[in-house]
Design a protein with these regions (language model features):
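Solvent-exposed loop/turn segments at secondary-structure junctions
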Residues: 35-38, 73-79, 106-112, 165-170, ...
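Short amphipathic alpha-helices and their capping/turn segments at secondary-structure boundaries
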Residues: 21-26, 81-101, 145-156
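Surface-exposed cleft-lining segments at the edges of enzyme active sites
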Residues: 74, 123-140, 186-192
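Bacterial N-terminal signal peptides
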Residues: 9-19
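Oxyanion-hole/transition-state-stabilizing segment in secreted/luminal serine hydrolases
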Residues: 80-136, 166-167
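Catalytic His-Asp segment of secreted/periplasmic serine-dependent ester chemistry enzymes
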Residues: 164-255
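Serine-esterase "nucleophile elbow" of acetyl-processing enzymes
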Residues: 24-74, 101
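Bacterial N-terminal signal peptides that target proteins for export
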Residues: 1-10
Length: 255
């Protein structure tokens, strides 16, 4: 009887030895967005996404190499993120565990509106405010859809939503009325003439609906001003990108 038991155990060991072993899913980080997430303005091209990925790979977080997929495209609007980046992001997010996803967007949607000739008097013209509200509504809906699909693909993912700063605050970048419009378009509360609030309010609301965390950028960039921007009135410099990394780490580690 003992001989039979030993034979069965040996057979089981041999069977297990030849069975394919499922590879453990590798930690992953998927970034969607525009030129800020791509890293334009960084002297090394690393921007904020690459050093943040280094943080995720560190012993204090995943303690393992984290596979990075940066899908961000310079100039992308929210519609471009949904059309050109989302499908690949969903596939990558579902293939990694644990996984972190960051989503940036909306800045180009607003920038193209704010630099238009009609924008100078926008805060005083109801028809212009109506167009701005419509633009913000569309951006919010697209971000909401993207976050919903990402959450469905990776229910346990840590999702980060990057809010926008106002680059027009840089010296010589815009007339005061356009700087004010930029601020309002981003941070006007829902009770203001911009119904539903500025873009960042909407991004925070969309994040809350999908259990995502928020990378807050408006106040840090407003505080440091020119020190955080390159000379193109759009992108961060190396110091600006370090601010984004800091805010991303803060958001990631928040309860």
């Amino acid at each position: 009887m003992r001989s039979l038991q030993n034979s069965i155990v040996l057979l089981a060991v041999l069977v297990l030895a030849v069975l394919p072993v499922a590879a453990a899913a590798q930690p992953g980080y998927v970034a969607l967005g525009d030129s800020v997430d791509f890293g334009i303005g960084s002297s090394t091209g690393a921007g904020w996404v690459v050093p943040f990925n280094g943080f995720l790979s560190s012993p204090s977080v995943f303690n393992a190499p984290v596979e990075l997929l940066n899908l961000a495209v310079p100039g992308a609007e929210t519609k471009d993120v949904d059309q050109d980046q989302l499908a690949a992001a969903v596939a990558a997010a579902s293939a990694h565990s644990p996984v972190v996803v960051s989503l940036g967007g909306g800045g180009n949607d607003l920038r193209h509106f704010i630099v238009s000739p009609a924008a100078h008097a926008c805060l005083k013209v109801q028809s212009c405010l109506a167009r701005l509200n419509a633009l913000l509504n569309e951006a919010e809906q697209r971000v909401d859809l993207a976050l919903k699909k990402l959450r469905e693909a990776a229910p346990n993912a840590t999702i980060l939503v990057r809010t926008q700063y106002n680059p027009l605050r840089g010296t010589g970048c815009a007339a005061p009325d356009l700087v004010a419009l930029g601020d309002a378009s981003l941070e006007a509360p829902p009770s203001s003439a911009i119904k539903g609030g500025g873009l960042n309010w909407r991004l925070r609301a969309a994040a809350a609906r999908q259990g995502a965390k928020v990378i807050e950028l408006f106040l840090p960039f407003a505080f440091f001003g020119d020190s955080a921007l390159v000379g193109d009135c759009i992108h961060p410099n190396d110091f600006g990108y370090s601010l984004i990394v800091l805010q991303a780490v803060t958001a990631f580690t928040a309860p």
